[in-house]
């Protein structure tokens, strides 16, 4: 029986024979989906969905006539039928997401196995000669661009085999004769950091995520049964039984509410983020290290692997207070305790397993004196354990030792639980671990004894690796706060103390820097223990104090980064240093600190002046000494806190390292996609040059979002497109809440994601193309970016009708009512303008309406104006850029992917139906301007890529987008209908038309929010 969306015959042209497994899985899920709907809603609903879907082509893009027909169908629905249809389409998208994820994981496993066999013969040092076509270069670049290295496209070489794996990367480096000493130097300093954030919080409820995991587990069981059946094993009834379980699970899912019942608290978001560590990453990261070590040994057996924490994790969840009043100092403290609770529970579980495993008897194995001595010390400190277990384990020293270890861990956990609750621990005198280092030392003692007596234990080795990576803290917490919060706090403090003749905020930048520099070197405290200030100022002060408390309790490693959002000038950084000094996080007398101040440059103007800001900072003796580790030493020496941190390379501030964060979201909202990407690219190059000039190592922190409009997209390609000198083995990237499920829900997908990021960092650092340094190319990009920005701002900021257009034709107001994040959608001003609107709901709204405007608008006009100068030559030049220049290819590829998801006919339907009658004519003009830019951009991108259709170069992605587009269209019609009725109801002007009968605002809002959920699932991102 054909499915509602596609029968196999209908989708045969979408999926080639090599993807029969995926087609088979899609068929199973579609049949299950249809069965659920038939049982839960009846055959009439199934028929309705088929009718709605049949109005659109498999590629989407509903015509005007089709839109009219769909609306007529929807007009006949009551509210319950409309909601059921919306839920059905949303369920379909989430099931398809599961299938595609599982298929991708399966493909990665297969490809990794194939690559290991494929690259085995490549372990020699065969030379690769350049395949450049010098004649073509000379023809195209008669403007001084035809240098010898232009043809050596090292970044693209080997891409067919690379696929982002270690197994292919190291043979590639060998073939290209990269000096092993360079590889070793890079590996030794390799530092890849992924930072989890909570906004936009994943729109899918945790409860629904649990249902999805059950479906994934059952599908994997079905794989095993089907594979056994192919080999002639198993039982005929097994597959049928699993399908019945799948049907039951999906029916339970159908009867579960998709919408969040309440706005999540910050600790809810913490729990959500930590889920991925609990389920996947805690066990997965050690496997990443083993994979790296094995692949390196296959090609460069004499090189040393990186430190085990070469790939580490940070978090903003519970510590990012920029615009989120719910993140308080108390919440940040609880977050650290919560993280420790989770990691301690995992260690306790592992130690219990080791007790069962290490049943080695002294009758049959030697025991070294150091283990026996430690047991004597344990007996004196934990006599209750000895009394309870000494008889049982009298000949089993490893079990007895681990029993002592277990008790110390449990005492540590109990103390941490009291701290989490805000209580005074009652077991302070009990033996416990004050740091992960103490726990690690005991594990290594056991490991040493096993090794010396000819034994090994993989479970123990794995636990040691986990402790080395995660310590007792799991992740590092970054503090983030907006720059004006610090200046406003100082303004109030100084006004209270009457230290300045005028308000601090009235000082010029030069006056601020002069006063701050002097005050930083003053030993007297500025802020007393009592805080007679406003709540906002007290919150800023308490934040620094809680960082100090965190470092004392959990070690410096727990929280040593303070990010200043909307950083614009030197005083923004010095203000944070002064407040850190007041909390004893920085000692200006010796220029030593335990906190790293990280400026975040976000707008285009701030990106452009970032180099000047950093130069001024590096010129300040106090700041330069802080980076070096103090006036008298190049090594950071800090007073040991009560809890000694784990001695890893990142335990203290790394000497001569400056971290700078670059924001993709606000720069894009400010100037458009092309201009934003180019300004960030330029900023990286200029920041690297200034850092080299002052002998400072630079780590760029990329504030990427999940969507293309906020810097999202494939991380591997994005890293390869960065200026090579800006990476040097170090990178830090945000992982937004909305993408965590797609990247980290399944172990093999998580490993592959981390592996591709790491290989890209290594490749970009060692195989630099030099294309970013070709000045004529840069001049062309400068022109394109400027033209794109002008056209973008002409619409967004200068078109007088645009703000009203945005608020009427998109569901921005309804999105703000989704209970998906603890963070408000708007900045505190509360104005309905673009400056107060955050980048996330801005992008979310355009995604819902199928415009996806922030990710492409302005690109077409910029290209067209460039082509108009010399059409043939400039088209040839752009095609050459696309083939040779990783940065340009990344930009065009992202635009192409976004354009493939745009449906301008559907977007026009939003404009026609949601515009107020008196505004329709002026809004139609705005829409016409947007539509013209879309078609222009699409046509020129196709010319540059030399594709007949969008995404012809990536057929797998093309098929996925087509499959989704066709079903998002009817869901969009339902959304428009519900939004129109809802807004009429709000205006007390309800009339018949869109959905018959009268319904409460609550019912209509619920229906609209369900469609938002569904479209987000179909588009696979929110903002």
From Swiss-Prot:
EC assignment: 4.1.1.31
One Pfam entry name: PEPcase
Cellular component, GO annotation: cytosol
Catalytic function, reaction form: oxaloacetate + phosphate = phosphoenolpyruvate + hydrogencarbonate
Superkingdom of the source species: Bacteria
Record key words, sorted: Carbon dioxide fixation, Lyase, Magnesium
Bilayer-spanning residue ranges: none
Active site feature: 199, 669
Entry's Gene Ontology BP terms: carbon fixation; oxaloacetate metabolic process; tricarboxylic acid cycle
Co-factor requirement: Mg(2+)
GO MF annotation terms: magnesium ion binding; phosphoenolpyruvate carboxylase activity
UniProt cross-references to InterPro entries, sorted A to Z: PEP_COase, PEP_COase_bac/pln-type, PEP_COase_Lys_AS, PEPCASE_His_AS, Pyrv/PenolPyrv_kinase-like_dom
This protein's record includes keyword Magnesium: yes
Function as written in the Swiss-Prot or TrEMBL entry: Forms oxaloacetate, a four-carbon dicarboxylic acid source for the tricarboxylic acid cycle.
HAMAP family in alphabetical order: PEPcase_type1
Annotated family: Belongs to the PEPCase type 1 family.
PANTHER family per UniProt: PHOSPHOENOLPYRUVATE CARBOXYLASE
Protein's UniProt name: Phosphoenolpyruvate carboxylase
Species, as recorded: Trichormus variabilis (strain ATCC 29413 / PCC 7937)
Gene of this entry: ppc
């Amino acid at each position: 029986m054909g499915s509602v969306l596609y029968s196999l015959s209908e989708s045969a042209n979408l999926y080639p024979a090599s993807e029969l497994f995926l087609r088979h899985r899609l068929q199973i899920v579609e049949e299950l989906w249809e069965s659920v709907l038939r049982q839960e809603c009846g055959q009439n609903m199934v028929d309705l969905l088929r009718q709605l879907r049949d109005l659109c082509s498999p590629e989407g893009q509903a015509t005007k006539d089709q839109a009219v027909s769909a609306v007529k169908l929807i007009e006949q629905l009551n509210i319950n039928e409309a909601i059921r249809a919306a839920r059905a389409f949303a369920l379909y998208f989430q099931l398809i997401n599961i299938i595609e994820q599982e298929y991708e994981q399966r493909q990665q496993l297969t490809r990794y196995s194939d690559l290991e066999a494929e690259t085995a013969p490549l372990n020699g040092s065969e030379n690769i000669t350049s395949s450049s076509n010098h004649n073509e270069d000379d023809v195209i670049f008669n403007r001084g661009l035809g240098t010898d290295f232009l043809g050596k496209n090292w970044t693209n070489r080997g891409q067919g085999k690379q696929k982002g794996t270690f197994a292919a990367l190291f043979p590639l480096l060998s073939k290209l004769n990269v000096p092993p000493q360079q590889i070793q130097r890079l590996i030794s300093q390799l530092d890849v950091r992924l930072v989890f954030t909570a906004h936009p919080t994943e729109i899918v409820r945790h409860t629904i995520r649990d249902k999805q995991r059950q479906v994934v587990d059952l599908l994997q069981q079905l794989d095993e049964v089907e594979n056994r059946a192919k080999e002639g094993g198993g039982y005929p009834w097994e597959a049928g039984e699993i399908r019945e379980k799948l049907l039951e699970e999906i029916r339970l899912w159908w009867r579960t509410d998709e919408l969040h019942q309440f706005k999540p608290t910050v600790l809810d978001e913490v729990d959500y983020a930590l889920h991925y560590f609990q389920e996947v990453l805690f066990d997965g990261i050690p496997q990443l290290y083993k994979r790296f070590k094995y692949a390196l040994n296959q090609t460069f057996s004499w090189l040393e692997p990186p430190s085990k924490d070469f790939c580490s994790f940070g978090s903003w969840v519970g510590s990012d207070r920029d615009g989120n009043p719910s993140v308080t100092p108390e919440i940040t403290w609880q977050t650290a305790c919560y993280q420790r609770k989770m990691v301690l529970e995992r260690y306790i579980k592992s130690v219990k397993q080791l007790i069962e495993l290490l049943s080695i008897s002294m009758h049959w194995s030697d025991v070294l004196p150091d283990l026996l001595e430690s047991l004597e010390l344990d007996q004196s400190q934990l006599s209750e354990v000895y009394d309870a277990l000494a008889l049982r384990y009298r000949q089993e020293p490893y079990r007895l030792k681990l029993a002592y270890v277990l008790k110390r861990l449990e005492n540590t956990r109990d103390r941490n639980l009291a701290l989490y609750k805000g209580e005074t621990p009652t077991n302070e005198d009990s033996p416990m671990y004050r740091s992960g280092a103490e726990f690690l030392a005991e594990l290594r003692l056991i490991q040493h004894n096993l090794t010396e007596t000819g034994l090994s234990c993989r479970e123990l080795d794995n636990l040691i690796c986990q402790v080395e990576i995660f310590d007792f803290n799991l992740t590092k917490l970054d503090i983030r706060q907006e720059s004006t919060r610090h200046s406003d706090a100082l303004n109030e403090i100084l006004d209270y103390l009457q230290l300045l003749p005028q308000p601090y905020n009235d000082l010029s930048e030069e006056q601020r820097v002069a006063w701050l520099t002097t005050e930083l070197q003053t030993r007297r405290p500025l802020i007393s223990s009592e805080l007679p200030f406003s709540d906002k100022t007290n919150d800023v002060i308490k934040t620094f104090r809680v960082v100090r408390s965190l470092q004392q309790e959990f070690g410096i490693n727990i929280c040593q980064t303070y990010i200043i959002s909307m950083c614009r000038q030197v005083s923004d950084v010095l203000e944070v240093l002064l407040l850190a000094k007041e909390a004893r996080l920085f000692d200006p007398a010796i220029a030593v600190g335990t906190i790293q101040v990280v400026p975040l440059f976000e707008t285009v103007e701030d990106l452009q002046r970032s180099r000047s800001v950093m130069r001024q900072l590096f010129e300040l003796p106090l700041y330069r000494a802080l980076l070096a580790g103090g006036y008298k030493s190049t090594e950071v020496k800090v007073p040991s806190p009560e809890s000694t941190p784990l001695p890893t390379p990142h335990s203290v501030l790394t000497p001569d390292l400056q971290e700078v964060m670059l924001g993709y979201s606000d720069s894009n909202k400010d100037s458009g996609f092309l201009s934003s990407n180019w300004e960030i690219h330029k900023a990286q190059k200029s920041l690297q040059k200034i850092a080299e000039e002052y002998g400072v190592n630079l780590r760029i922190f990329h504030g990427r979002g999940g969507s293309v409009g906020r810097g999202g997209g494939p991380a591997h390609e994005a890293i390869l497109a960065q200026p090579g000198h800006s990476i040097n083995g170090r990178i830090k990237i945000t992982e937004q809440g909305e993408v965590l499920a797609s990247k980290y829900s399944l172990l093999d997908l998580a490993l592959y994601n981390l592996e591709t990021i790491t290989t890209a960092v290594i490749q970009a650092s060692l195989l630099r193309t030099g294309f970013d340094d070709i000045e004529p190319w840069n001049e062309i990009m400068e022109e394109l970016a400027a033209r794109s920005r002008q056209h973008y701002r002409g619409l967004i900021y200068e078109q007088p009708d645009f703000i009203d257009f945005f608020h009427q034709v998109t569901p921005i107001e309804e999105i703000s009512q989704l209970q998906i994040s603890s963070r408000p959608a708007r900045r505190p001003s509360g104005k309905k303008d673009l400056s107060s609107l955050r980048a996330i709901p801005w992008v979310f709204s355009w995604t819902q309406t199928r415009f996806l405007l922030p990710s492409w608008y302005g690109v077409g006009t910029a290209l067209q104006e460039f082509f108009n100068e010399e059409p043939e030559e400039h088209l040839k030049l752009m095609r050459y850029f696309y083939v040779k220049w990783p940065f340009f290819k990344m930009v065009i590829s992202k635009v192409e992917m976004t354009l493939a998801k745009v449906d301008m006919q559907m977007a026009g339907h939003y404009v026609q139906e949601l515009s107020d009658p008196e505004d329709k004519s002026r809004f139609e003009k705005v829409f016409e301007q947007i539509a013209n830019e879309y078609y222009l951009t699409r046509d020129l991108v196709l010319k540059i890529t030399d594709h007949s259709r969008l995404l012809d170069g990536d057929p797998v992605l093309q098929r996925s987008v087509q499959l989704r587009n066709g079903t998002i269209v009817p869901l969009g019609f339902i959304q428009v209908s519900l939004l129109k009725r809802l807004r009429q109801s709000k205006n007390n002007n309800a009339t018949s038309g869109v959905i018959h009968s009268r319904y409460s605002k609550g019912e209509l809002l619920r229906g609209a929010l369900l469609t938002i959920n569904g479209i987000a699932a179909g588009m696979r991102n929110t903002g």
